[in-house]
Amino acid sequence: MTDIADVIRSLMREVPDFPEPGVHFKDLTPVLADARGLAEVSKAIADAARGADLVAGVDARGFLLGGAVAVTLGIGVLAVRKGGKLPPPVIGATYTLEYGTATLEVPAEGIELAGRSVVVIDDVLATGGTLAATHQLLTRAGANVTGAVVMMELAALGGRAALEPLEVTSLYTA
């Protein structure tokens, strides 16, 4: 059995001093661009997401992972979009960034979310703001959010605590 954390670690690119001096940026793009990497990450996320009847992929790399996982599980995928990208009406949630705010949205019509078991998928858990906003807007739409699955967690930023009591699964922790 392959350890998924080893797969991610072996394919991930580390970029020193980006986006600013002293930061070691962990670029997951090579993991997703590698056929084996994408397949193994998708399978590991799908294993963690079993039992949901809808995947919510968060803009933007959550779309890639969410689509692959939904196909694997034989369920649908919902794109959780950045604000202003969907036609009205929408259900949105605003969250705080380091220098301002951002909004995430899902359609308010055309997709029945009430009572559905939804798992949220994203590439990285950092401060937890994006996933918390996603959880909030899906819950407001009536969905039962069963958990969140991320490819990588930046543990030092404390995002997991911001999401309690939501169950969070991370494939790789940095």
Swiss-Prot record:
MF terms (GO), sorted A to Z: adenine binding; adenine phosphoribosyltransferase activity; AMP binding
Record field: catalytic activity: AMP + diphosphate = 5-phospho-alpha-D-ribose 1-diphosphate + adenine
EC number(s) reported in the record: 2.4.2.7
PROSITE patterns, alphabetized: PUR_PYR_PR_TRANSFER
Predominant localisation class: cytoplasm
Keywords associated with the record: Cytoplasm, Glycosyltransferase, Purine salvage, Transferase
Source superkingdom: Bacteria
Entry annotated with the keyword Transferase: yes
A Gene Ontology biological process term: purine ribonucleoside salvage
GO cellular component: cytoplasm
Cellular localization per UniProt: Cytoplasm
Pathway, per record: Purine metabolism; AMP biosynthesis via salvage pathway; AMP from adenine: step 1/1
CDD domains to which the protein is assigned, alphabetical: PRTases_typeI
Uppermost EC category: transferase
Role: Catalyzes a salvage reaction resulting in the formation of AMP, that is energically less costly than de novo synthesis.
Subunit structure: Homodimer.
Family: Belongs to the purine/pyrimidine phosphoribosyltransferase family.
UniProt protein name: Adenine phosphoribosyltransferase
Protein species of origin: Mycolicibacterium vanbaalenii (strain DSM 7251 / JCM 13017 / BCRC 16820 / KCTC 9966 / NRRL B-24157 / PYR-1)
